[in-house]
């Protein structure tokens, strides 16, 4: 079986060139980066929660995670400016391809009651965003060691100009969209 990067050059590029009539290989849309974000709003009361979220995300990504801080104080949410309220990581290059491979072939099929991903979750510029309700669908996260089940946001940024191009790019990789 080909890894995702090889699959892109050997199968996806020729298929998209044929479908959209690109003359140059560099016109073909490609995945630029994958961003993982975990909002931990309940970390306001307990600093240990943010540490556990960071550890989970680092295990998933295989690289250091950035802790996101509140931009301004909001009394309704009981947060102050500068308090840690989440964490994020941006994957590029080899780590991005490895994560994308695990996402498509291992994690997505493990989602409970899975009937396909929403094909309308594109932003108008060919980038796809999805939410995962449980981080335990990934094999790196051990179920026994999880203190709390958290969700995370996954954004796949592509060089595609339109949603149709982005959708076809992800479909060519075997992304399971709803019919």
Curated annotation (Swiss-Prot):
Coiled coil: none
Organism of derivation: Marinobacter nauticus (strain ATCC 700491 / DSM 11845 / VT8)
One GO-annotated biological process of the protein: translation
Gene3D superfamilies attached to this UniProt entry: 3.30.1440.10
GO cellular component: ribonucleoprotein complex; ribosome
InterPro entries in UniProt: Ribosomal_uL5 (IPR002132), Ribosomal_uL5_bac-type (IPR020930), Ribosomal_uL5_C (IPR031309), Ribosomal_uL5_CS (IPR020929), Ribosomal_uL5_dom_sf (IPR022803), Ribosomal_uL5_N (IPR031310)
A Pfam family matched in the record: Ribosomal_L5
Lineage: superkingdom: Bacteria
GO molecular function: rRNA binding; structural constituent of ribosome; tRNA binding
Job of this protein: This is one of the proteins that bind and probably mediate the attachment of the 5S RNA into the large ribosomal subunit, where it forms part of the central protuberance. In the 70S ribosome it contacts protein S13 of the 30S subunit (bridge B1b), connecting the 2 subunits; this bridge is implicated in subunit movement. Contacts the P site tRNA; the 5S rRNA and some of its associated proteins might help stabilize positioning of ribosome-bound tRNAs.
Organism lineage string: Bacteria, Pseudomonadati, Pseudomonadota, Gammaproteobacteria, Pseudomonadales
Protease recorded as keyword: no
Protein's name in the database: Large ribosomal subunit protein uL5
Entry keywords, A to Z: Ribonucleoprotein, Ribosomal protein, RNA-binding, rRNA-binding, tRNA-binding
Subunit details: Part of the 50S ribosomal subunit; part of the 5S rRNA/L5/L18/L25 subcomplex. Contacts the 5S rRNA and the P site tRNA. Forms a bridge to the 30S subunit in the 70S ribosome.
Family indicated by similarity: Belongs to the universal ribosomal protein uL5 family.
